[in-house]
UniProtKB/Swiss-Prot annotation:
Entry function: Stabilizes the manganese cluster which is the primary site of water splitting.
Location of this chain's protein in the cell: Plastid, Chloroplast thylakoid membrane
Listed name of the protein: Oxygen-evolving enhancer protein 1, chloroplastic
Any GO BP annotation: photosystem II stabilization
Length: 31
């Protein structure tokens, strides 16, 4: 992916959180 590496830790966490909630893997990843 050609995304610039300017993501902050919070942005990465938010992105992961949204992806996890969107795919339903939150049930598999208790973190």
């Amino acid at each position: 992916e050609g995304a610039p590496k300017r993501l902050t830790y919070d942005e990465i966490q938010s992105k992961t959180y949204m992806e996890v909630k969107g795919t339903g893997t939150a049930n598999q990843c208790p973190t």
